[in-house]
C-alpha cells in the first residue's frame, strides 16, 4: 500500500475521519500535520460514536502508530482530556501507539483569551472556535511561542520564555483595558501538565523517516478543508494553517522525495461552519433537508453547518491545488429525497463568468452560481455497499461529477458506519 495524503476539498467536514479510519486498517501509521483542536473528526463503529479533535483517527485501530506532527498547535489540556475520554471507552493510548512532535507550539489559556478579544474587535466576525488556534500560530510565526520541547527546560528558563511571550500579550490586554496575565500562572499550568505529555514526545521527523526507510505505509490526515487554507481559502474567513496536501510534508518533516497518493474528499453537497462566502448556500427548505438528513452540526463547535448544492468550481480548484489523483464522495444518501439536484459549474459576477474562485473578497461576496441541473433518484442509498445497486440517477450524478472534475471517484460513503462504503476502485491502495 502506498502512502496516502487525505485532504478535504471543500470547507472541512467532508468525512475525513471515517475515511482515514477505514484506510488505516491497512496502514502502519497515521500523521496529523496541521491545525489543532479546532478541527473535529467523527467516527462511528458498531453504533458507537467517537469524536476526535487532536488525535489521529488511527487511535481507534489496534497496532497503529498515531503521530502528531510539528504543524499542529497542541492544546495540552485538550489532548489529555481526549486521551482520558478514549481510555474510559476502552481505547488505550500508550507511548507505543502515540508520538508527539517536540516542535509543536503549545496552545495556552492566554491564546484562548486573545482569540475572544480579537473576535470582539473585528467589524465582521470570522466565526472562530475560540480555541486559541490563530493566536498560537501568530506567536509561532513571531518566534515567541512556547513549544513542547520547552517543557523539558528548567523552571527558570521556562519562566523566562513565558515572560517573553507575555510582553506582547499583556501589551495587547492593556490596550483593551484587560488585566494582565502573570507568568507564574502560565508556568504552573505547564509544569502541571508536562508529566502527562512528555512521555509521548519524540523527534517525529526522525520517526517518520525511519518508517519510510522500512517501507511502512503512512497516511497523512488533513484537518479542515482547502477553502479554509490561510493562503488559498476564502480569506479572511479562513483558518490559520495551510490545509492543502503540500502541508503534509512541512507539517511533519517528511521530505518531498517520498511520493504519496493524494486522495481528496468531497461531500455530495457542500457545507460550511461559521461566517464567510458560500456560493451555493440554500437558505430554504432544501438547505433544511440537507441539514436534518446529514445531521450537520459541527463536531467541535456544535454550531449548525450551512448547507448547499455541490460546488464543482471549488472542488476543481482544490484538486489542482493539491494534485489530487482520486476522490472519495461522502454522504451521497443525503441527496436521496430530492427530485432534482444542482451542480455549480461556474460563477457569475456582473457580465463576467469565472471557472475559478477569484481571490478578491469583494468579488467573492457578489458571485452568483451557474448551475447544471440533474434528475434526482428519490430512492434510499443509505448503507449501500454496491455500486451497481445504486439508482441510475445516482450513478448519473456520480459520473457527471467525475466528468466535470476530470478525476475518478474511488470510494463512496453512504452512511456513518465504518463499512458503509462503496468501493469503485481500490487500485490506489496497492
From Swiss-Prot:
Residues involved in IMP binding: 13-16, 38-41, 129, 143, 224, 239, 303
GO biological process: 'de novo' AMP biosynthetic process; IMP metabolic process
SUPFAM superfamilies: P-loop containing nucleoside triphosphate hydrolases
Cofactor: Mg(2+)
One Pfam family of this chain: Adenylsucc_synt
Binding site for GTP: 12-18, 40-42, 305, 331-333, 413-415
Primary location: cytoplasm
Note accompanying the cofactor annotation: Binds 1 Mg(2+) ion per subunit.
Keywords: Cytoplasm, GTP-binding, Ligase, Magnesium, Metal-binding, Nucleotide-binding, Purine biosynthesis
Binding site for substrate: 299-305
Catalysed reactions, as listed in the record: IMP + L-aspartate + GTP = N(6)-(1,2-dicarboxyethyl)-AMP + GDP + phosphate + 2 H(+)
One cellular-component annotation, GO: cytoplasm
Listed EC numbers: 6.3.4.4
GO MF terms held by the record: adenylosuccinate synthase activity; GTP binding; magnesium ion binding
Subcellular location(s) per record: Cytoplasm
Keyword Lipoprotein among UniProt keywords: no
Residues holding Mg(2+): 13, 40
Domain of life: Bacteria
Entry keyword Iron: no
Family: Belongs to the adenylosuccinate synthetase family.
Subunit relationships: Homodimer.
Protein name, per record: Adenylosuccinate synthetase
Source organism of the structure: Ehrlichia chaffeensis (strain ATCC CRL-10679 / Arkansas)
Gene name of the encoded protein: purA
Amino acid at each position: 500500500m502506498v502512502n496516502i495524503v487525505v485532504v478535504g476539498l471543500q470547507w472541512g467536514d467532508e468525512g475525513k475521519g471515517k475515511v482515514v479510519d477505514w484506510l488505516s486498517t491497512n496502514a502502519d501509521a497515521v500523521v496529523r500535520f496541521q491545525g489543532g483542536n479546532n478541527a473535529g473528526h467523527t467516527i462511528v463503529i458498531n453504533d458507537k460514536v467517537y469524536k476526535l479533535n487532536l488525535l489521529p483517527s488511527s487511535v481507534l485501530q489496534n497496532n497503529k502508530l498515531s503521530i502528531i506532527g510539528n504543524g499542529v498547535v497542541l492544546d495540552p489540556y485538550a489532548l489529555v482530556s481526549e486521551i482520558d475520554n478514549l481510555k474510559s471507552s476502552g481505547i488505550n493510548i500508550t507511548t507505543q501507539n502515540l508520538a508527539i512532535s517536540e516542535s509543536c507550539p503549545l496552545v495556552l489559556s492566554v491564546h484562548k483569551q486573545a482569540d475572544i478579544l480579537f473576535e470582539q474587535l473585528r467589524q465582521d466576525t470570522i466565526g472562530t472556535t475560540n480555541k486559541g488556534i490563530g493566536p498560537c500560530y501568530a506567536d509561532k510565526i513571531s518566534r515567541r511561542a512556547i513549544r513542547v520541547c520547552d517543557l523539558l527546560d528548567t523552571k527558570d528558563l521556562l519562566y523566562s520564555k513565558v515572560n517573553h511571550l507575555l510582553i506582547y500579550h499583556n501589551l495587547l490586554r492593556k490596550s483593551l483595558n484587560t488585566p494582565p496575565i502573570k507568568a507564574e500562572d502560565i508556568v504552573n499550568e505547564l509544569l502541571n501538565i508536562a508529566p502527562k505529555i512528555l512521555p509521548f514526545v519524540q523527534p517525529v521527523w526522525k520517526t517518520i523517516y525511519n518508517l519510510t526507510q522500512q517501507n511502512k505505509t503512512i497516511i497523512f490526515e488533513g484537518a479542515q478543508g482547502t477553502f479554509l487554507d490561510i493562503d488559498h481559502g476564502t480569506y479572511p474567513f479562513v483558518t490559520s494553517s495551510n490545509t492543502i496536501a503540500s502541508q503534509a510534508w512541512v507539517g511533519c518533516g517528511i521530505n518531498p522525495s517520498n511520493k504519496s497518493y493524494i486522495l481528496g474528499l468531497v461531500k455530495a453537497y457542500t457545507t460550511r461552519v461559521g461566517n464567510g462566502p458560500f456560493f451555493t448556500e440554500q437558505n430554504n427548505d432544501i438547505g433544511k433537508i440537507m441539514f436534518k438528513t446529514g445531521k450537520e452540526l459541527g463536531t467541535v463547535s456544535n454550531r449548525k453547518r450551512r448547507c448547499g448544492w455541490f460546488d464543482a468550481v471549488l472542488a476543481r480548484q482544490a484538486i489542482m491545488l493539491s494534485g489530487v489523483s482520486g476522490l472519495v464522495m461522502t454522504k451521497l444518501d443525503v441527496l436521496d429525497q430530492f427530485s432534482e439536484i444542482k451542480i455549480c459549474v461556474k460563477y457569475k459576477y456582473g457580465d463576467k463568468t469565472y471557472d475559478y474562485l477569484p481571490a478578491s473578497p469583494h468579488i467573492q461576496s457578489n458571485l452568483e452560481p451557474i448551475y447544471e441541473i440533474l434528475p434526482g433518484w428519490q430512492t434510499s442509498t443509505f448503507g449501500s455497499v454496491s455500486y451497481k445497486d445504486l439508482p441510475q440517477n445516482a450513478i448519473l450524478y456520480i459520473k457527471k461529477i467525475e466528468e466535470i472534475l476530470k478525476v475518478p471517484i474511488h470510494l463512496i460513503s453512504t452512511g456513518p458506519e465504518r463499512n458503509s462504503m462503496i468501493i469503485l476502485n481500490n487500485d490506489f491502495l496497492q
